[in-house]
């Protein structure tokens, strides 16, 4: 049995956290003894873990050090102004403040959080392992500037899509030989099972659209709301439901009010089980501005839903326009045009659904990549 250590930020309610849990659940228990080291105490999704995992909370010798760790990522404009030496001394200092002792030499150690954070530096300098890998979850790799020194200690740098790997290699070509794709895995049968659970669905007798994701600028809800405003003016009989929470909730609800869409665009909040809502919608829409690998698109494909996504590089790895779903340019007008087209041509959506049923998703080759780090 191999000793596997994974360092992550938390088990909170984000896409990368879901991806982490799904990866752990997919690993054969007879092959891996897993230790999960967490930076934060947010364990909202811990109930999703199906197996016994040794969970360790990182502790620090001072409140000051712990507070510094909360600055786990910096905006790109800040990164451009600060020298790399600043981050090296910053991360080295915090790593020396960790009070946990990891004496074991692990077979594999994974920095699953990535994002150019303290986690990447900590695993590189304080964990002994035969093989090390770090994960990249987004197409915007600017923050990796802060951990370039530590990337040399990793055997693999995994991007969750080819788009992520390509963006990273353009920015940091000297690490090209270490970079490879490792797609996020999900338990398809579990998603199907959960989609059948009883849930009070507030859908009306009209064209029901669902979007799942955090209420943040990245996820493009503002674009969706503006697209909904266009659809309303075109007399389309629809209702759009957003599932998720986030820092932009108040701002987005104000935009809904400004556009007089209280009856057409409804925020349902976070849902432990969003799959019944997805299963019963007429169209699943993902209007993201950028993504690493869109897990909700994988879930929508697993449920064989009619799908419309913004035309971003990582989405193109999953969606072939007109084959297994549809893509639209990242604008309210383009999104509204494509939704109106699908509303008026349901047979086109049925065609993509049939394709999804005939071409199930297979993740079996992804897990083998851990053996080849």
What is the predicted role of each segment?
Residues 334, 341, 347-362:
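A short, well-ordered alpha-helix in the C-terminal region of glycosyltransferases
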């Amino acid at each position: 049995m191999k000793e596997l250590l994974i360092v992550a930020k938390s088990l909170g309610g984000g896409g990368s956290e879901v991806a982490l849990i799904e990866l752990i659940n997919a690993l054969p228990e007879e092959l891996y003894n897993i230790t999960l080291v967490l930076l934060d105490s947010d364990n909202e999704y811990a109930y999703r873990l199906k197996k016994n995992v040794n969970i360790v909370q990182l502790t620090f010798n001072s409140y000051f050090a712990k507070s510094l760790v909360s600055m786990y990522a910096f905006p790109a404009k800040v990164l451009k102004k600060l020298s790399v030496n600043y981050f090296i001394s910053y991360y080295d200092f915090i790593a020396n403040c960790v009070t946990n002792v990891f004496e074991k030499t692990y077979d594999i150690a994974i920095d699953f959080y990535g994002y150019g954070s303290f986690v990447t530096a900590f695993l590189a300098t304080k964990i002994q392992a035969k093989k090390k890998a770090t994960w990249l979850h987004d197409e915007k790799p600017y923050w990796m500037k802060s951990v370039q020194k530590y990337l040399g200690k990793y055997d693999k740098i995994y991007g969750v899509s080819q788009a992520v790997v390509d963006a990273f290699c353009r920015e940091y070509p000297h690490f090209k030989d270490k970079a490879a794709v490792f797609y996020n895995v999900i338990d398809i049968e579990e998603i199907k099972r959960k989609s059948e659970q009883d849930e009070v669905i507030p859908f009306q007798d009209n064209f029901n659209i669902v979007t799942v994701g955090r209420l943040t600028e990245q996820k493009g809800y503002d674009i969706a709301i503006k697209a909904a405003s266009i659809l309303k003016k075109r007399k389309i009989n629809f209702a759009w439901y957003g599932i998720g929470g986030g820092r932009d909730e108040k701002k987005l609800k104000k935009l809904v009010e400004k556009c007089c869409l209280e009856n057409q665009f409804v925020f349902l909040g976070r849902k432990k089980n969003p799959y019944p809502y997805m299963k019963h919608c007429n169209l699943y829409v993902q209007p993201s501005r950028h993504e690493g690998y869109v897990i909700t698109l994988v879930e929508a494909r697993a449920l064989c839903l009619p799908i419309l996504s913004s035309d971003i590089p990582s989405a193109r790895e999953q969606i072939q326009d007109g084959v297994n779903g549809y893509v639209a340019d990242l604008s309210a007008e383009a999104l509204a045009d494509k939704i109106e087209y699908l509303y008026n041509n349901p047979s086109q959506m049925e065609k993509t659904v049939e394709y999804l049923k005939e071409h199930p998703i297979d993740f079996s080759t992804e897990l083998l990549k851990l053996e080849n780090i």
